[in-house]
Amino acid sequence: MPLKRSLKESIERLSSFQSKYNIFTSINPSPYSITNKKGTKETLTGCVASIKDNIVTKDFPTTCASHILENFKSPFDATVVKLLKQAGVHILGKTNLDEFGMGSGGVHSIRGPVINPLYPHEDKKIMGGSSSGAAASVACDLVDFALGTDTGGSVRLPACYGSVLGFKPSYGRLSRFGVIAYSQSLDTVGILSKKINVLRKVFHTLDKYDMKDPTSLSVELRELIEGNKKVRRPLKVGIVKEFSHESMPIGFHRLYLSLLEKLINLGLEIYPVSIPSVKNCLPIYYTLSPAEAASNLSRYDGIRYGYRDSELDIKDGILFAPTRSKFGTEVKNRIILGNYNLCSDAFKNNFIKAEKLRVNLIDEFDGIFRFPNVLTNSKGNPDGLDILIVPTSSKLPGSIRDFEEEEAKSPANSYINDVFTVPMSLAGLPSLSMPLKEKTPIGLQVVGQYGDDSTVLDFVESIS
Amino acid sequence: MYKTWRLCRTHTVGGLCHDGSHRFVSTGGAKIGKKFENMNQIRDYLSRPVWSVHEYLGINTKEEKLEPPSAEAVKKLLRLSGLPLEGADIKEIQMRLAKQLSFINKLHNIPVEGEKHTKEYDARLVQRNTKQLNYTKLLEGISHQKQDAELGEVSGSWKATGLAAESKNAYFVVKEGLLKNRK
């Protein structure tokens, strides 16, 4: 199967898919054509890609699907974009998303919701978010791969709903310089593709220390991780008790059991495992991420860049309120919640408690993995596991109308979509969502210890 | 069925307490069970879900009691958030916050394992236990800094006000009301 699709073919098909599924926020009128002179085995020359519209590009706008950044054009490329251009990748366009990455349905965008292309003849279904356009661009075969961002599951959930691969590498592996911050302790650049060999090549192209990103994993720690790699046979796989829920999509268990049987036949060992802190992850996540979002989004005042109210800078004594009124409803809700969590009345009770519980979670993950964690100095459990397998979603994609109605009743209804993905985000672990069946929105995450991204990729490749 | 492992901060921060004979002390926390021997054991294990996220979070249950923050508290939050009061549906925000808080307030009842030794700053996904910087080292670091093109520090390459909707003579413009009439 060829690695690269024809750029001409993608451009020809783009307009009909765009009008049906609302995938892109902007389309590059002249995609790049750069020859990779080095011609290394990792070359991506001629591959076609899409970029989520919260990753800055100097050649066309970066809007975060928000009025606040409508028409904003960055003076520079994000490091990940720069590396792709150097590798000879054609960038087809910027993809739609939940505003500033806030949402799990792909419906909170000034450009309107992304429609799931797996259901062309049914009531319009959600794509999952927030990297909704990224997943749709891959599902429609418009691109070889897409770059998204994953804060609490924003690459993995839409990848699952689009029946494609979605990889969130270890936190700090890929540079976030030029990625517009939502929640900086969680934000990670992720890769979506239909082919594991493409995904792996993209990962290797981008997996580099970047001095421009203060949270980029240092060269020293990358070398330490490489040094820790040993052949582990047989590979030990864990099924986490706390991810076993009563309500799972119809058909999930049959496909799940079939995969487990395949693993046993391949000689892998399978173990039950309990990680009690997993249960606490949603409240931890929804305490920390809105607090970080409130801080990050305080910069949008309209003075230096982005949208600015043409009349006023102050209203009711509140600075920049006329400009900031242009944030969408979900973003405003999260800013308000975040400021509540950060204000003096709640600070000690909520924020610090959530941080400490996050430490407990990280330590529990350290306790069950065989591979060392170079961040925490965990030496690894010699009797521990190499891989965890975890469902990606507890639901199938519902209709856009139902999703919006449920969310209006209570925000917690949409937060629950993140229950299987948030634990790995909080611990910074590499996690790859893979479809259990072609063109079916049921996925499984393959999870490794921090830094052990290659084991995750090898595992998925070995069973694909 | 489960082996348990103690997380020991005295020997390795966040790591495992090793007694030298590849055996670990059991105190709770994460646990690995015995290897599954066949598919029947796996089927049985997966057929018994251990919790319901809806029940845990008290969603759609009768016990859910909502205590909305006061209207004044919401107005204060809007000010803190730089969002306008005019047009804001205070009651709707109160109810929404109440539902969000009933969700995240679960945190209050969860005990922190090893509370005394657990440092909130270890939640950051960066290397723990790095060497502390002092004033002298900071000064030394600054003294070696120089303009770096890799960081985009190229003289004359960028106009600071180039992206502003309003600017005058290379200055940003803030309107008169910004400095007056503030509460």
UniProtKB/Swiss-Prot annotation, chain B:
Topological relation to the membrane, as annotated: Peripheral membrane protein
Record key words, sorted: ATP-binding, Ligase, Membrane, Mitochondrion, Mitochondrion inner membrane, Nucleotide-binding, Protein biosynthesis
Pfam family, one: GatF
Reaction it catalyzes: L-glutamyl-tRNA(Gln) + L-glutamine + ATP + H2O = L-glutaminyl-tRNA(Gln) + L-glutamate + ADP + phosphate + H(+)
GO biological process, one term: glutaminyl-tRNAGln biosynthesis via transamidation
Enzyme Commission designation: 6.3.5.-
Record carries keyword Nucleotide-binding: yes
Protein family: Belongs to the GatF family.
General remark: Present with 172 molecules/cell in log phase SD medium.
Name under which the protein is recorded: Glutamyl-tRNA(Gln) amidotransferase subunit F, mitochondrial
